[in-house]
């Protein structure tokens, strides 16, 4: 039997949802472990010891300056080189909501001068269920989501709108298959509010790096791991996004270990 992959959950002051992420990883067969940023700076833990990393949501450092920028700066200072080596090795790095903002600020998904996560079009915090649909063939999540319709997901953010400096950036993202998920209504992808809760260009909800192992998304899969957390399900066999998401991540990390 293959060993449970060790998944590190990166934290600092203001992080939340880490407990939900922890138990989602655990219930999907992984071995989760909290990594406070001070553990990295003190040398108590190293990112290279993990098979996967997750940066959860929250309001790191109170979202001062802008969402994710302080966490990104601190993480880059204490473990930037190690994280880039981790990514270059092909290990999965996931950023959820505030974690997505951190990945963008670190330039781990795309050139941060050409794409950003900015204020919602509504200029307010948006918190509700919506839907997402997989629009890429990302190797981590393809078997769980691709071609299987739309999935309910919770969102909760004020700075989640993906904006690009020019349309050619979006074209490049599509060419490289980096648009992983899009916001949807109960039937298919839509730009309409409130299904697209923030006004993201082309309803983009999730992006990856070119290699496909660094993935950021604004929805919170850890908040819909169980069927009872869904608004409703069409059939008794319907699976929810959270379980599929974490099962896929853990399976991918496990398979990489041989």
UniProtKB/Swiss-Prot annotation:
**Key words, A-Z:** ATP-binding, Cytoplasm, Glutamine amidotransferase, Hydrolase, Ligase, Nucleotide-binding, Purine biosynthesis
Q: What is its main location?
A: cytoplasm
Gene Ontology MF term list = ATP binding; glutaminase activity; phosphoribosylformylglycinamidine synthase activity
Task: Name the CDD domains on file.
Answer: GATase1_FGAR_AT
One Pfam match: GATase_5
List, alphabetically, the GO terms of the cellular component aspect: cytoplasm
Q: Which domain of life is it from?
A: Archaea
Q: What is its EC number?
A: 6.3.5.3, 3.5.1.2
A Gene Ontology biological process annotation?
'de novo' IMP biosynthetic process
Q: Which catalysed reactions does the entry list for this protein?
A: N(2)-formyl-N(1)-(5-phospho-beta-D-ribosyl)glycinamide + L-glutamine + ATP + H2O = 2-formamido-N(1)-(5-O-phospho-beta-D-ribosyl)acetamidine + L-glutamate + ADP + phosphate + H(+); L-glutamine + H2O = L-glutamate + NH4(+)
Domain Glutamine amidotransferase type-1 span(s) in chain numbering = 7-238
Please state the pathway this protein functions in, per its UniProt record. Purine metabolism; IMP biosynthesis via de novo pathway; 5-amino-1-(5-phospho-D-ribosyl)imidazole from N(2)-formyl-N(1)-(5-phospho-D-ribosyl)glycinamide: step 1/2
**PROSITE patterns per the UniProt record, alphabetical:** GATASE_TYPE_1
What is the active site of this protein?
97 (nucleophile), 220, 222
Q: InterPro entries, per this entry?
A: Class_I_gatase-like, PRibForGlyAmidine_synth_PurQ
Q: Where in the cell is it found?
A: Cytoplasm
Q: Subunit composition? A: Part of the FGAM synthase complex composed of 1 PurL, 1 PurQ and 2 PurS subunits.
Q: According to its UniProt entry, what is the function of this protein?
A: Part of the phosphoribosylformylglycinamidine synthase complex involved in the purines biosynthetic pathway. Catalyzes the ATP-dependent conversion of formylglycinamide ribonucleotide (FGAR) and glutamine to yield formylglycinamidine ribonucleotide (FGAM) and glutamate. The FGAM synthase complex is composed of three subunits. PurQ produces an ammonia molecule by converting glutamine to glutamate. PurL transfers the ammonia molecule to FGAR to form FGAM in an ATP-dependent manner.
Tell me what this protein is called: Phosphoribosylformylglycinamidine synthase subunit PurQ
Q: What is the lineage of its organism?
A: Archaea, Methanobacteriati, Thermoplasmatota, Thermoplasmata, Thermoplasmatales
Q: Which gene encodes it?
A: purQ
